Amino acid sequence: ACVAEALQVESKGRELVKQLEQRMEGITDRACAARERPRVACLEWLEPLMAAGNWVPELVQRAGGANLLGEAGEHSEPITWESLLESDPEILVLMPCGLDMKRTREEMYWLTDRAQWKTLKAVQNGRVYLTDGNHYFNRPGPRLVESLEILGEIIHPDLFAPSFKERAWQEAG
């Protein structure tokens, strides 16, 4: 809205903000109708491990998940392997700061080379996902609406068509 005001297109800016808010509300409403809220951990860095903070915990909650690590409105924090193992997420979303999916896949050895990796419920159930953190999760802005859509697709694939799959997220496999 501030940019629109500076460019003297305030009404267009207000309309765009309204459209983005409506998209977010629609996603949240659909996700909240889900019977289950899977336990989700989002990692913003792989070595050392860092739990995603800032806006990501709120996005997880709005997408119908129960955020396990990181606090909404707080900076991303380093975590221990023990805390990741104790939280034992049903879904693990990798969104390293500044990395695209190709680079994230290359860096996964920081996780997969550890013996404990295979003990995680998300790993055992094939619910580990790579995202393009650089484009969708690591910066605030209007694109966070798409970030919410991506998390909806990952957390509740039965409720959301995979329109961002392969382009913005993929199964770690």
Residue ranges and their predicted role:
Residues A1-G173:
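N-terminal ligand-binding lobe of clamshell/alpha-beta domains
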